[in-house]
Each structure stands twice: as structure tokens, then as C-alpha cells.
Amino acid sequence: MFVEGFRVESPRVRYGDGEIESEYRYDTTEVVAPPSPEKGWVVRPKSVTYHFKTTTTVPKLGVMLVGWGGNNGTTLTAGVIANREGISWATKEKVHKANYFGSLTQSSTIRVGSYNGEEIYAPFKSLVPMVNPNDIVFGGWDISSMNLADAMTRARVLDIDLQKQLRHHMESMVPLPGVYNPDFIAANQGSRANNVIKGTKKEQVEQVKKDIREFKEKSKVDKVVVLWTANTERYSNVVAGMNDTMDNLLASLDKDEPEMSPSTLYAIACVMEGVPFINGSPQNTFVPGLIELAIKKNSVIGGDDFKSGQTKMKSVLVDFLVGAGIKPTSIASYNHLGNNDGMNLSAPQTFRSKEISKSGVVDDMVSSNAILYEPGEHPDHVIVIKYIPYVGDSKRAMDEYTSEIFMGGKNTIVLHNTCEDSLLAAPIILDLVLLAELSTRIQLKAEDQDKYHSFHPVATILSYLSKAPLVPPGTPVVNALAKQRAMLENILRACVGLAPENNMMLEYK
């Protein structure tokens, strides 16, 4: 059964004026190393009471996209307008209605309990108050000056009938000049770069900060979230004395250090303005000095790289195989695509960023099972991406998984996945900005703490949506998709005093 919404009645939950307060018992385990080899490990159950406070006043949200005129930016903007205006359009198959399919927050459900033996589900977004995506105000930057209506046509993602209905909404949307450094992206992007911020790197950062303030004032929004959906950059060199600490990073900015990428400059500007910044590409935007700066300023950062198609499947399948006691020994992943992302990734230095992002997705699953894998052992894992213009945004992903099974047997799984690249990425961008905003309205404290505090500024709450999740120093990296979703859902359940969904169903046993 499906219900549109619910209210929690519990002595541990209080719905107040503009906030929800909850008391939550966090049950976990503490592992103690043996004092000597002959004594075994000890596991101790541990309970800590946390108090959550969630502001329920939903702000008017502005979203600024870096690379607003690209395929992802135009597709998301067009999709939100189509939903807001209730647009429908005809194709040769049928008449379609605007929707938010592919969005975790808007189109998925959570189990809230059972009634007369039937499980009850509610919208994910009903857990706590969230921004309505139809109310988002969009803006952003792009190194191309093309308006969003023409950029939408250039992208070749949306059906023509839909484009015609959206054109008059998007013709007046023109990106602000963007930060451009040809050393960090493929040379083939130079022909687009007619809309760039001039000056030194420090001057560029100041301009981005000014752009954010002016956008917020002009659009009359309460909060702004900035997200990078521009070209994949090459990896930046992390060098002692340059970007390894906050002080060195800021000194390098003053010195106009060449090895500071555009994405890092945007991130610095956002942290300085106290605006959440999310990196949707695989490069190492968040160099150590930038992470230190974000922590000091308590400004939200998250990423890296949208987890939308092939990698999402991989994070499910390998988790299943290893969890079933099957040993993946070889993973071969091949992609070809024809959009501008594929064109940019045809350069070796930018492809390397994507290769690193995609390769690490199975690491935590492999390291979880020392029965299958010896120390240091890892599946052979190769990733290939090729640019084929004709297929456009319709990316093809082909994977072969070879595994060892019972008594020396072999198992091979082959997948062919046609990923409509931007149509998969756009709702993920939507979820990222909505959850980043929501995270700024949640505070918590443990039972031995006097004051509430916000989540750590390195936003692990966004891990489900990221190929290479950014985590605070010393925090385990989790890539398995089911674990990531459970973490996100259970944190929001805690905000309203609900127990985590453990699927034990003891009442029926």
C-alpha cells in the first residue's frame, strides 16, 4: 500500500514551530583487538543516544551550475521547467508527461511499516521537508556564451516536440562567463571558449564570489548550491608547499600558481562564501588544502563524479557477487559515446581522471572478504572509453565479469547497457543539490555533548550519488550501492525518530 505522507507519534519526537526534534538510539559495535595472539578478537555491542534537530522551513533555493550550457545543465534546466509547467509532448511511441523518474528524492519510496499484514510505503521526500524542485531558480557559468535554448538543441538529448515548447522559456537564459584554463581540459574544447573570465586566478575567484552574491540578490533566493557539471579536467598535481595545506593553497592563489584547476578555483570561491559546492566530475578538485579550508570554514563540499550508469551497475553487481561468496577475478568495462563529454575524454590526460574514478568502485567490496582474496589481491580491472560522434548522448556500456566459483569453476556475466547519459545524470544532479541543501538544516549531538553541531562539511550523505565518494579524513569509503542508500535513508529516518530499516520482520517469525 502507498501513502502520500505520515507523521511520527512517539515520546522521542517533537514537532515544533519550524523544526523537528528527535531522540535516536544508535546501536553499533566496538571491536577490540586481542591483547595477545592466542586470545581472540572481542566485539562489544554499543549504544549511543543522539539528538537530532531539523529545520522544517524550506528555503527558496538557487542552483548555479558550472557548465550550465552543457548537456547535463540544459537537460536538468529543461526538465525542471517542463515539470513546473506541466508540459506533455508526443513521440512516435506515445504522449509523454514531464516527470522526475531517476531521482531518488522525487521518485523512490521508503517502507514505513505494515498495516493488516500489508507493507506500507511512502515517498522518500516525505521523510523530512525538502525543497520542491519546481521552485528552484537556475543560473551558472559556461565558457560558451550560447543561450540555453540553443545549447539544448546542440545537445540533441530531448525530443523535438518538447524542445519547441521549452524554447521560449530558455532563450533568455545565458550563462555567465566561466573560468577557462586550456591546460586542464582537452584541446578540442577551445572552439567553445568565447565566454571566459579574464585576470589572475585570485581575480577569477573574486569574480565567482561576486557572481554568487549577485545571483542570490537578483533571484531573491535564500540559499545557493553550486555544482560542477563542466568538462572533466586532468588531475592536478598535489605538491608540498603548493596545495597540501590551506595556507599553502591560499598562498598559491595569491601567487597565481599555474597548477590550480578551474574547478578548484570555483570550490575556493564557494567555501569562502559559505555556499555548498559539489563536484560532479572525476578530477581531484578537492586537493588537501581545499578540504582543510572547507573544514575550517564549515562549508559543505561533496563529490566526486556522478554515479549514473555503468558504475552504478558495477557497485550493485560486485557487491552481490562478493556477498554471495563468489570471487570476481576480471572486470572489463568498455564505453563509447558521442557527446561533448566523450569528445573531452578522448584526450589521455582527462580520460585518466575518469579511469581513476571508475576503477576504485569495487575496492571496499573486495577488501571486505579475506576468504576470497589474499592480502593485496584484487580483480584485474580495465576501463576503456571511446568517442563515436554518431551515437551522441546515448552512451553504450559493455561489461564482462569473470568470477571463480565452486571447485575451480568459472562464471562469466556480460552486460550491455545503453545509458542515455544526460537523462540519467540530470536527476542525480537534482538529488545532489536537494540533499546538500537539506544537510545544512540538520543538526545533531551525542548524549555526552552540550551543543548541537552540523554534519561534517565533507558530505558523506551524498555518497550514494557519487562514483568516488569524498569522505572526511580517516573515514572508511563505502561504494556498495545498497549500503550507501541505507545510510542515507536511515539518517533521514533518525531525523524523525524512526528505527533503521533492518528487514528482520520478527513480528512474522
UniProtKB/Swiss-Prot annotation:
Whichever gene encodes this chain, its name is RINO2
What is the E.C. number? 5.5.1.4
Per the UniProt record, the lineage of the source organism begins with: Eukaryota, Viridiplantae, Streptophyta, Embryophyta, Tracheophyta
Listed under catalytic activity are: D-glucose 6-phosphate = 1D-myo-inositol 3-phosphate
| Co-factor requirement | NAD(+)
Q: Which GO terms describe its biological process?
A: inositol biosynthetic process; phospholipid biosynthetic process
Q: What is this protein called?
A: Inositol-3-phosphate synthase 1
List the Pfam families. Answer: Inos-1-P_synth (PF01658), NAD_binding_5 (PF07994)
Pathway where this protein functions = Polyol metabolism; myo-inositol biosynthesis; myo-inositol from D-glucose 6-phosphate: step 1/2
Say which enzyme class the record assigns.
Answer: isomerase
Q: What does this protein do?
A: Key enzyme in myo-inositol biosynthesis pathway that catalyzes the conversion of glucose 6-phosphate to 1-myo-inositol 1-phosphate in a NAD-dependent manner. Is a key enzyme in the phytic acid biosynthesis pathway in seeds.
User: What InterPro entries does the record point to?
Assistant: Myo-inos-1-P_Synthase, Myo-inos-1-P_Synthase_GAPDH, NAD(P)-bd_dom_sf
Entry's Gene Ontology molecular function annotations? inositol-3-phosphate synthase activity
Keyword annotations: Cytoplasm, Inositol biosynthesis, Isomerase, Lipid biosynthesis, Lipid metabolism, NAD, Phospholipid biosynthesis, Phospholipid metabolism
